[in-house]
């Protein structure tokens, strides 16, 4: 089994990593792919020189920062992982990456946006939950949150 865990450096994303590490610690046999999705390169071009090498370095550095805490959790737990830094629309990039890496499941954090904000802004976790062909677990964050919401 291969599990994709998209992270953005936020606490809800780290909760998803902790959830997967707990499952692995309880005997689940799976490999782990940590991934982060960066803004499309054209957004960086507005504030940086139009140099492909510079843009690639900036995207990589920002992505590495987003992955750092998740990687530290995996290392502390003695769990090996693969890492991916991609750019584009967050939900679509997660869906594309899950397919490209032949992932069997996606585990991701929920932002906990209210219904109004979610309707106005859209929700990466909601879109992935609806569109992914594989099971998706959305790990809730915060006091009183249920352990996880699963579709699949």
Could you describe each region identified by the protein language model?
Residues 16-17, 44-47, 95-96, 118-120, ...:
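Short, well-ordered secondary-structure micro-motifs
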Residues 33-35, 82-86, 137:
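General small-molecule cofactor/ligand-binding pocket signal
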Residues 1-50, 79:
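Small/aliphatic-rich secondary-structure junction motif
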Residues 108-130, 145-149:
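Glycine-rich, Arg-bearing micro-motifs that act as flexible, cationic patches
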Residues 1-18, 131-152:
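Intrinsically disordered or low-complexity boundary/linker segments at protein termini
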Residues 36, 110-111, 141:
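Short secondary-structure boundary segments
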Residues 72-106, 144-152:
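Structural beta-alpha unit
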């Amino acid at each position: 089994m291969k599990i994709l865990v998209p992270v953005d450096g936020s606490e809800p994303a780290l909760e998803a990593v902790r959830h997967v590490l707990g499952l692995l610690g309880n005997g689940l046999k799976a490999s782990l792919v940590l991934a982060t999705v960066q803004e499309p390169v054209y957004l960086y071009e507005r504030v940086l020189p139009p140099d492909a090498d510079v843009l690639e370095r900036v995207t990589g550095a920002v992505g590495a920062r987003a992955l750092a805490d998740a990687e530290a959790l995996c290392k502390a737990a003695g769990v090996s992982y693969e890492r991916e830094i991609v750019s584009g629309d967050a939900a679509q990039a997660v869906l594309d990456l899950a397919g490209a890496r032949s992932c069997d499941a996606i585990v991701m954090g929920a932002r906990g946006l209210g219904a109004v904000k979610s309707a106005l802004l859209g929700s990466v976790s909601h879109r992935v939950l609806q569109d992914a062909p594989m099971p998706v677990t959305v790990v809730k964050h915060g006091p009183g949150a249920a352990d996880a919401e699963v579709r699949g």
